[in-house]
């Protein structure tokens, strides 16, 4: 059985349900885990830090789909992505769609938008601009093409003195794929995007937070 030295867990659709309510059983289970638990989310830094504090896990957080990393609650955000490239791509999309931006002033590495247009058509419009358009299941994110949760996980792992291959990761959407690629063991919850399940070493029987509990049980982290 794979024995991780740390875990990275997505938030929306993994620890929460479709209404973004945290699963209390998952929270209780994560508090019992004796190895570092890192939240890896598409959300902004202040949200991720607050969630980590509320849940009771590590202060280390991966935010904005890997575009921002923070190692201490009161520390500084380390920005890994170029937001300006993303803004330029948004300007192109605005010529074709009604684009509704989300949390624009708080995002440091990417641009987040309401899921109100065809993502595949939009991807063609911004092709070659050095960005990628990702669907988190809750919003669209235009990200620097050099940014991913996977690269951020490798960055974090190096700082922690371990390999990303010693991480187990739990997620639900396509923005978790790169994280699954670099981790030692990837677990998709039952409600996960079918594309993510193709990269998973395990798919839990239950969705979202209940699936997280099952994942931790499978890894032998709940005693």
Swiss-Prot record:
Catalyzed reaction equations: 2-phosphoglycolate + H2O = glycolate + phosphate
UniProt: Mg(2+) binding residues: 10, 12, 172, 176
InterPro entries xref list: HAD-like_sf, HAD-SF_hydro_IIB, HAD_sf, PGPase
Gene Ontology, cellular component aspect: cytosol
Highest taxon listed in the record's lineage: Archaea
SUPFAM superfamilies linked to this entry: HAD-like
Active site: 10
Coiled-coil intervals, chain numbering: none
Molecular function GO terms recorded: magnesium ion binding; phosphoglycolate phosphatase activity
Similarity section: Belongs to the archaeal SPP-like hydrolase family.
Protein role: Catalyzes the dephosphorylation of 2-phosphoglycolate.
Protein name, as recorded: Phosphoglycolate phosphatase
Natural source organism: Archaeoglobus fulgidus (strain ATCC 49558 / DSM 4304 / JCM 9628 / NBRC 100126 / VC-16)
């Amino acid at each position: 059985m794979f024995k991780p030295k740390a875990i990275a867990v997505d938030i929306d659709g993994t620890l929460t349900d479709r209404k973004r309510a945290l699963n209390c059983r998952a929270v209780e289970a994560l508090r019992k885990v004796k190895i570092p638990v890192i939240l890896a989310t598409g959300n902004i830094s202040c949200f991720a830090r607050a969630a980590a504090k509320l849940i009771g896990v590590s202060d280390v957080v991966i935010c904005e789909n890997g575009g921002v990393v923070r190692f201490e609650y009161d520390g500084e955000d380390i920005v890994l992505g170029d937001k300006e490239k993303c803004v330029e791509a948004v300007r192109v999309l605005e010529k074709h769609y009604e684009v509704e931006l989300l949390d624009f002033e708080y995002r440091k590495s990417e641009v987040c938008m309401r899921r109100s247009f065809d993502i595949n058509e939009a991807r063609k419009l911004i092709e070659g601009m050095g960005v990628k358009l990702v669907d988190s299941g809750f919003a669209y994110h235009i990200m620097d093409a050099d940014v991913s949760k996977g690269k951020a996980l490798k960055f974090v792992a190096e700082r922690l003195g371990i390999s990303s291959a010693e991480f187990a990761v739990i997620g639900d959407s396509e923005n978790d794929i790169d994280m699954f690629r670099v981790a030692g063991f990837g677990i998709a919850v039952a409600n996960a995007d079918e594309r993510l399940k193709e990269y998973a070493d395990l798919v839990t029987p239950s969705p979202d937070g209940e699936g997280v509990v099952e994942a931790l049980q499978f890894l032998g982290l709940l005693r």
